[in-house]
Amino acid sequence: MNRFDRPTASWDYGEREHHHRPSDPPWEDLPADIRARAIVRAMVANFGECEVTEDDGKFVLSFRGGSGGRLIDEGPTRARGAYLTLRDPGPRTFDRNALPVYCAHCSVNPELQPLEWGCTPTSIEVPAEKPGDPCIHDVYKDVTAMPDEVYLRLGRTPPSSG
């Protein structure tokens, strides 16, 4: 049986890793401007508008959220009860008491999943706090230079401490 013949996928990361883990080249080996450009394209493809700034250590992508931003701005979680809200502060909710479930993919995919694979986070996310706020992606030029606070928020030991 090959990987496409499986009747159902497991939600266990060990099983999903076979299907979704990136291969070559590793994301952290790509130049930061290429990594930032890939994220910008995804945001624009989801109908977001993105502003890019740069400092010595990182690219800062500030965007009006596309799909998830509209969920926050239009309030379907409150108005129609159509979407779940995660209410367990921790790494996948950015330590918040409430986060629309849709927004959790921004902690899982670029932050938690790479760490589980022994890699570095692809970008550091700061989701919108309230309607109208932008979401932020920090794309570090040197992936080993991420602040210790990032690793602590993700429930990990910072590399500088290890």
Q: Which stretches of residues belong to each language-model region?
A:
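N-terminal accessory segment detector
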Residues: 1-134, 141-162
